[in-house]
Regions:
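Substrate-binding rim/cap in mid-to-C-terminal beta-strand-loop elements of soluble/periplasmic
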Residues: 315-354, 427-469, 483-484
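Short, structured active-site-proximal loop/turn typified by the sulfatase FGly-forming signature C/S-X-P-X-R
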Residues: 37-86, 144-148
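Beta-strand elements within well-structured catalytic alpha/beta cores of enzymes
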Residues: 23-35, 52, 78, 135, ...
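His/Asp/Glu-rich, glycine-adjacent segments
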Residues: 83, 91-233, 241-249, 370-372, ...
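A long, amphipathic alpha-helix that forms part
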Residues: 209-231, 244-285, 361-363, 465
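Hydrophobic h-region of N-terminal signal peptides that target proteins for export
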Residues: 9-17, 164
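Non-catalytic, well-ordered alpha-helical segments in soluble enzyme domains
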Residues: 128-137, 340-377, 454-480
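Secreted, luminal/periplasmic, and some membrane-associated catalytic domains
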Residues: 46, 61, 70, 92-120, ...
């Protein structure tokens, strides 16, 4: 009996020694359309961004290495450690089985918490695993994950495929909602939050600081009510600040409206760090801050100061190119759709009219290249035949998912603004530094203050978090850990 006891204790000790050290909580904070230079353009108060800059590890040269640089692809790439070519989220919208769908559209589900008859949403279009998924696999599904954002895709994609919940803002019902993919009824704490904050939620949350405040307030309630960071396994809380993007699209970078949201964001981060310190402890949580993409200054802002800029409006480009193709082939609508700097050929029209596909493709690319603002219109399937820089070819390839992405990718000249000249708002989506250079800061558990200017990538975020936690990288991950 004594010998058996000794053996059992030895096995227990061995298992304990093999158990890796992990934080109680991982907090992912993504600020939609936050340019890297915003870190240094604002006069931050105490406790928020200033704490991150002073106590965190900064990666000052973090790049998105694919196109298009848009919200859904960015959130998916951060949490999967890979790009649209592998995770399948080819844009905010893309073609799926011949239909234009949103990145998280799922007609097999329905909405919960607002108008329950609304179209459902889920992460099913995301075909690779995430940080949260890998945490659950590593802990036999004891880890818990929650996603919070105003935008549906910004809450759903980061939370992975098996979270406790994902909650986003529904304008129609002026409430935070979810879908039947996760549950059939809102948790009491979310319903109570909607009731308590009804007036604020019903306000212009997209363009006012209150949208940021509500996002963090709901995240704090998730932290408390789901007891995140209080269990035996590491949990994940994914927060995305969406109104920084929405307001910038309408009013432009560094507009007073956008500035006011960033000032409020600074205060909310300060408060949330205090909450985390009190509930979890600074040494028990790992936090990272990044962005899903950057943003291009508008045509009016650039030209007002004599800086080079131009505009190109994709809906007009679709109409103009189709007119050229109709004259050449005698068939209307040979280009079916455009989205995220890509154009889709109308395969049905080409086939039914017995047209030569390659001839239509060549003509379409030529038609789309006619405006001087466009440098290349690329047949992605034959991209290696184009005389464009290798680095740009690789970004196009890494953003292309066959069947979902458009067959033609548009490369505007550097500095070209996607929109109309009179629009004051910002935009994004291209390979340029303004759109692809993003902030990246790690702080908390096992992170020493410091910074680097070496090249890092958006895909390195998931690789770094998983490596620090000693869990398997997401199954499509192509990133490299930042820390040795």
């Amino acid at each position: 009996m004594k010998r058996i006891f000794v053996v059992v204790m030895a096995v227990v000790a061995l298992c304990a020694s093999a158990q890796p050290s992990r934080p109680k909580l991982v907090v992912g904070l993504v600020v939609d359309q936050m340019r890297w230079d915003y870190l240094y353009n604002y006069q931050w108060g105490e406790g928020g961004f200033k704490t991150l800059l002073q106590e965190g590890y900064l990666c000052n040269n973090t790049i998105i290495d694919y196109v298009p640089t848009v919200t859904a692809a960015g959130h998916a790439s951060i949490y999967t450690g890979t790009t649209p070519a592998f995770h399948g989220i080819a844009g905010n919208n893309f073609m799926l089985n011949g239909r234009n769908v949103t990145s998280v559209q799922d007609d097999s589900e329905r909405g919960v918490g607002g108008n329950d008859k609304t179209r459902g949403k889920s992460p099913r279009n995301l075909i690779t695993t995430t940080i949260a998924d890998q945490l659950q696999l590593a802990t036999n599904f004891k880890s818990r994950a929650v996603g919070i954002a105003l935008k549906d895709r910004a809450a759903i994609l980061p939370a992975g495929h098996h979270p406790v919940g994902a909650y986003w803002y529904d304008k129609g019902s002026a409430s935070f909602v979810t879908s039947t993919y996760y549950m059939n009824k809102l948790p009491r704490w979310v319903a109570d939050f909607n009731k308590k904050h009804h007036d604020e939620i019903a306000s212009d949350v997209y363009n006012l600081p209150v949208g940021t405040t509500l996002t963090f307030a709901l995240a704090e309630q998730a932290l408390i009510n789901e007891k995140l960071g209080q269990g035996e396994a590491t949990d994940l809380l994914a927060i995305s600040v969406s109104n920084t993007d929405m307001c910038s699209h309408y009013y432009g970078t560094h507009s007073p409206k956008v500035d006011s949201i960033y000032m409020q964001l600074d205060k909310e981060i300060a408060h949330f760090i205090e909450v985390l310190d009190q509930r979890i402890g600074r040494d028990n949580y790992l936090l990272f801050l990044s962005a899903d993409h950057g943003g291009t200054h508008s045509y009016p802002r650039m030209t007002e100061h004599g800086l080079p800029s131009a505009t190109w409006y994709h809906p007009d480009a679709l109409v103009a190119a189709n007119e050229v193709l109709e004259k050449q082939f005698g068939v209307k609508g040979l280009l079916k759709e455009q989205m995220e700097y890509t154009f889709y050929l109308n395969h049905e029209a080409i086939k039914s009219n017995r047209l030569d596909y390659d001839a239509v493709m060549r003509a379409a690319c030529q038609a789309l290249e006619l405006p001087e603002e466009i440098q290349w219109a690329v047949d992605v399937a034959n991209i290696d035949s184009y005389p464009i820089p290798t680095i740009l070819k690789e970004r196009i390839k890494l953003g292309y998912f066959p069947g979902r992405s458009g067959e033609i990718y548009i490369v505007p000249r550097t500095g070209v603004y996607a929109g109309k000249k009179e629009e004051a708002g910002s935009n994004h989506g291209t390979w340029s530094q303004s759109d692809s250079h993003i902030p990246l800061i790690f702080m908390g558990w096992h992170v020493n203050p410091g910074e680097t200017s070496r090249l890092t990538h958006m895909t390195d975020i998931a690789a770094t978090v998983c490596a620090m936690l000693h869990i398997q990288l997401p199954n499509g991950c192509i990133g490299t850990p930042v820390f040795e």
